[in-house]
């Protein structure tokens, strides 16, 4: 089966093409914060010849605590993302949480993302599909890889074939996630070899059972990312922060921004090697 392609301007997502980085920050902490982070990503990806889509959220709507920082909201957040596009000339992606957010987000963003916790919400799927935008579908932690076929089918029935599928880990008992490397191949087969993205950042989450925020295993991000790239991916989803200890959300899982270039250099080497090998099917 030939790998399906999804095009975004000059960028091509495909499981047999050089990987695309969906990289950025967890949440829009301020306009300058977003511009500065995007500048680092753009410079590093330009030097390494890695296609880039910049990611940031305008609203973290599923925080554990009502007191946690959520972001600037839809209107101000989309204005910030537009400024990133205008300043750095790079495409952007954000996540939407209600059907009403889909159309305005798609007017600014090149890709809109369906959050993992909401992947079975049919009204939201219909609204997102109706924009005609490229959609990044996060696999819920509670779904098996093969069940992603049902989410993909909803989008197709709603007339949208511009789909990316994204692995972000699976529940492993209480308060922990694991990444099943066998699941990558299952998702590819069940979803007709749609471009597969690996969200290495959120796969590193683990919770304090009594806490109100997610913990993480940032020190293991390179191990997990290299393992995922070895499977043959269309893209990597990554969040970084200039000072993870001060991040407003998910700092324990964020890559320190100053380590972005050596981190991506290693992943590019793995990706280049894997995709230089001849195809081999084992029955």
Swiss-Prot record:
Query: What's a single GO BP term from this record?
Result: keto-3-deoxy-D-manno-octulosonic acid biosynthetic process
Instruction: Name the enzyme's class.
Output: transferase
Q: In which pathway does it act?
A: Carbohydrate biosynthesis; 3-deoxy-D-manno-octulosonate biosynthesis; 3-deoxy-D-manno-octulosonate from D-ribulose 5-phosphate: step 2/3; Bacterial outer membrane biogenesis; lipopolysaccharide biosynthesis
The listed locations are: Cytoplasm
A GO cellular component entry from the record? cytoplasm
Listed InterPro entries: Aldolase_TIM, DAHP1/KDSA, KDO8P_synthase
Q: Which SUPFAM superfamilies match?
A: Aldolase (SSF51569)
Write out the GO MF terms.
3-deoxy-8-phosphooctulonate synthase activity
Q: So which domain of life are we looking at? A: Bacteria
Main location per the UniProt record: cytoplasm
**Entry EC no(s):** 2.5.1.55
Known catalytic reactions: D-arabinose 5-phosphate + phosphoenolpyruvate + H2O = 3-deoxy-alpha-D-manno-2-octulosonate-8-phosphate + phosphate
- Give the keywords, sorted: Cytoplasm, Lipopolysaccharide biosynthesis, Transferase
Give the similarity note: Belongs to the KdsA family.
Q: Which PANTHER family match?
A: PHOSPHO-2-DEHYDRO-3-DEOXYHEPTONATE ALDOLASE (PTHR21057)
Protein name, entry field: 2-dehydro-3-deoxyphosphooctonate aldolase
């Amino acid at each position: 089966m030939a790998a399906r392609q999804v095009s975004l301007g000059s960028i091509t997502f495909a499981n047999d093409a050089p990987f695309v980085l969906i990289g950025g920050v967890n949440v829009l902490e301020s306009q300058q914060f977003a511009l500065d982070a995007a500048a680092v990503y753009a410079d590093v990806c330009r030097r390494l010849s890695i296609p880039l889509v910049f990611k940031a959220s305008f609203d973290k709507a599923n925080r554990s605590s009502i007191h946690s920082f959520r972001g600037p909201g839809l209107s101000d957040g989309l204005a910030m993302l537009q400024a990133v596009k205008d300043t750095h000339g790079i495409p952007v992606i954000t996540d939407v949480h209600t059907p009403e957010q889909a159309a305005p987000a798609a007017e600014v963003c090149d890709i809109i993302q369906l959050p993992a916790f909401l992947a079975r919400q049919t009204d939201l799927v219909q609204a997102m599909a109706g924009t005609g935008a490229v959609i990044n579908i996060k696999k819920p932690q509670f779904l098996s890889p093969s069940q992603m076929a049902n989410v993909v089918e909803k989008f197709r029935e709603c007339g949208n074939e511009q789909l990316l599928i994204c692995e972000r880990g699976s529940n492993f008992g209480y308060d922990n996630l694991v990444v099943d490397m066998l699941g990558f191949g299952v998702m590819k087969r069940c979803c007709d070899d749609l471009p597969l993205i690996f969200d290495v950042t959120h796969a590193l989450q683990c919770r304090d059972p009594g806490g109100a925020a997610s913990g993480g295993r940032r020190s293991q991000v390179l191990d997990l990312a290299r393992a995922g790239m070895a499977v043959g991916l269309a893209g990597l989803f990554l969040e970084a922060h200039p000072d993870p200890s001060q991040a407003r959300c998910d700092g324990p899982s964020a890559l320190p921004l100053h380590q972005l270039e050596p981190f991506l250099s290693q992943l590019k080497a793995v990706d280049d090697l894997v995709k230089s090998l001849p195809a081999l099917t084992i029955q």
